[in-house]
Amino acid sequence: MIGRLLIAVLTVFALLGLGTADAVEAEAAADYTQGVTSQATGSAQIWFKPTTPSALVDVHYLPNGGGEQDFRMTDNGGTWQQTVSGLSSGSTLEYWFTYDKGGPLHVTPHFTYTAGSGEGSGGGGGAGAGSFPIAFQNNTHGAYGDSQVYVTVLGQVTPGQWSYMKPDGTMAHISHLGATAPGHLTKNGVNYPNMSFTLSQAGSVPSPTQIRGGRIYISLGSPMYIPVSPDDQGWGGPDLRNSADPNSDVYYDWYEYTYIHGQVAFGGNTTQVDQFGFPMTSRLQQTSSGYDSTAGITLSRAQVMSQYAASVGAAFKPLQNTYRIVAPRSSNLFLAGGSQANHLQSYIDQTWSYYTTHQFTLTRLGETFTGRVSGNALTFTKNGAGPFTLAKPTSPDVVACAGALASGSDTEKQLGAEFCAAFNRGVAQNTANWYTPSAYYTSTPKNDYAGFFHTIGIDKRAYGFPYDDINDQSSVQILNNANPPTALTLGIGW
């Protein structure tokens, strides 16, 4: 649970009954896991689990800002424990450990625990200058109580190092050892770190002052089962193409955001790029700039599911199941080898044939792309510079905005993204319609899945495929400054 921290060396400790002893810095997170578990009111249990047996573990703590207390912990089956009493709600307990590894004693970094918050933490983040509150609204209308609505927040608060959020808003580095720590999750005989909390534990949390690649999973009736790599450098999200994935029978959805106080403006969005689990809304507010915008879906889940089934073509109906509607790019049906792998291929062929005999010209945002297809490639210029080449895409390339549409130079990728949007929206053969939203999804073939979510999204906005932000059609919300929002409110529907 600790991650790869820089650890200070404490050389002289007054250990209980041991006089003084030299201590060296602790090793990496692979050495141990630790935490604090709330018990009765005013009481908490500090625990420490070394990866190799220890002859002794001492805990040192500063309760309520008072004097240091030092205790030899009790070994309970390999997990060392110490109960602390007399903690007032909201008070902070600072603690650290000294432990044996068959040689010099090792000392851990200092951690903090807020009484009444659930567990202790070794990570950064939480409230402070540049932070803002993230509030969760349970709009499931009694279908799921707050104790059944789970939140899992993951992101990089330190570049290159993934962390997860605890109920008090502090961030802790992910660790594969959490899979064997007290309170870990188990499903189908496999253990997972418990990185989720419920709305009954925290209905609002402070955002880290910086987070890259932030993802807020919301799951109903179950926490998320997320494995962590053995080197603690990555984690595994739900695999929608794997029926054996532990989250395949879990109702979940998510919100994405990135924010670095003073450097990178807040940008976040609800998304259906990979799937729809249940309706979510996001309200982003910033009083200083007057920004106040809400995006997402306000229909009930039953309405979304029934309207989807009635609206899309036959090829897209099998994407719907009890737990979710899977996006074409995340379904084996629409990928190579699937029954719908060629769903858009005739349209792609016709478009490439059209631009063999007709000049391709796209002018947007002060830039002009001009070219013609020869063989399987579109050779083009941008504002007269070039030439550049865009290979003919496949249907799986289009639904995933990948392959030929995401290859080559930046300029080639730029036009590839434009073609991806045009193919999905059904306007590829008329560049005059590429930036005309009223023309989107009005002809076939097209991406029925993406088109449907644009019909039900607030202001017709949705993130239905990876480049759905082209021509500002997505649900993304971006501030025009790098100051913190006043608030982010996520509505959880059903």
Question: Model regions: which residues?
Answer:
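Glycan-association/targeting regions that enable binding to alpha-glucans and other polysaccharides
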Residues: 24-126
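Short, flexible coil/linker segments at or flanking structured domains
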Residues: 3-9, 36, 47, 81, ...
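Extracellular low-complexity, O-glycosylation-prone Ser/Thr/Pro/Gly-rich "stalks"
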Residues: 70, 93-111, 116-494
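Intrinsically disordered, low-complexity regions enriched in Ser/Pro/Gly/Gln/His and often acidic
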Residues: 11, 73-74, 427
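Secretory targeting and sorting signals
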Residues: 1-26
